[in-house]
Regions:
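Active-site-proximal loop/short-helix segments
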Residues: 1-5, 36-56, 82-103, 133
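Nucleotide/pyrophosphate-binding catalytic subdomain
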Residues: 5-12, 20-24, 48, 54
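Glycine-rich anion/phosphate-binding loops
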Residues: 11-29, 60-68, 110-113
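Acidic-leg catalytic submotif of subtilisin-like serine proteases
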Residues: 26-38
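Active-site loop-helix segments enriched in His/Asp/Glu that coordinate
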Residues: 50-66, 210-215
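Second-shell residues forming the walls of enzyme active-site clefts
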Residues: 70-242, 249-253
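C-terminal extensions of enzymes
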Residues: 248-269
Length: 269
């Protein structure tokens, strides 16, 4: 009737409630197992192009993606966990798999900001971290977003005002270390990511062999600091610490018996 407020349909309410429940279950289970951070949510749009993104995306519409991501992040927060929106400014419109190749998105900056990147400023007040894409946006910068000062410092920090932590994507991926025709070593890739504006660099699945490759990177970073090629950043360290949970996690047995956990399970599809 006149003056009455429109309310979402039951399907929409189920979707948002399920997203919050999924965030809570994910974060509470991880924390009960000793894991204090998860690189979620995926904010990429489902253009039907990317096999590596695919059903990891919430939807094609950036408004739907933002709504469901916000609900999921609320669930993460209820369990004491931060979040990481990825892959900035959007990985869903390219076919190539950035784990092995270097995808190229030829759209204009205006088109990207109006569509794929739209969730980032919309969620700016609740995003605690962002992970850039290993994608080249050729009409914006010749370097992949994760190595691009234009994307990370000028656009994400400057234009969008993001103040949280910026993680590199996994630099152990072959496609992640290709920059302007050069294949970078692990240490070179880490330094390039930090120089571009990342606060933290990820080098995953390199703990084999006693972690010798990781030790080498740390040793070479120390050498680079002595040579003046890189210096630890106090602000980056503050951003990292801000991602850590402030309250103790439940143990597994008490979690799975808790009423809020069981209610969350009931809300999942």
């Amino acid at each position: 009737g006149k003056g009455a407020k429109a309310v979402p349909g039951s399907g929409a309410l189920r979707a948002t409630n399920a997203a919050t429940a999924a965030g809570y279950v994910l974060a509470s289970e991880l924390r009960a197992c000793g894991v204090d951070f998860s690189f979620t949510p995926v904010l990429d749009l489902d253009h039907g192009e990317s096999g590596v993104i695919g059903d990891r995306a919430f939807a094609r519409d950036p408004r739907v993606v933002s709504l469901l991501a916000r609900c999921l992040m609320q669930g993460l927060l209820q369990a004491g966990m931060g979040n990481c929106g990825k892959h900035f400014p959007g990985h869903g419109a390219v076919k190539a798999d950035s784990h092995t190749d270097i995808p190229v998105d030829k759209r204009s900056l205006k088109a990207i900001l109006a569509d794929d990147a739209a969730p980032y400023p919309w969620l700016g007040s609740v995003l605690t971290a962002v992970m850039p894409a290993h994608v080249i946006y050729s009409r914006v910068d010749a370097r992949p977003a994760g190595f691009s000062k234009r994307w990370l410092q000028d656009i994400l920090r400057g234009q969008m005002g993001f103040q949280g932590a910026i993680f590199s994507d996994d630099l152990s991926m072959a496609g992640a270390r290709q920059v302007q025709g050069q294949s970078l070593s692990y240490t070179e890739a880490v330094l390039a990511a930090l120089d571009a504006g990342c606060d933290l660099a990820l080098l995953c699945n390199r703990s084999v062999g006693g972690g010798a490759e990781l030790d080498q990177v740390l040793d070479e970073l120390a050498e680079a600091a002595v040579k003046g090629q890189w210096q630890p950043n106090e602000v980056s360290e503050e951003r990292r610490l801000a991602l850590l949970p402030s309250a103790a996690a439940r143990d597994w047995e008490s979690l799975v018996r808790s009423a809020d956990y069981m209610r969350a399970l009931d809300l999942l599809p």
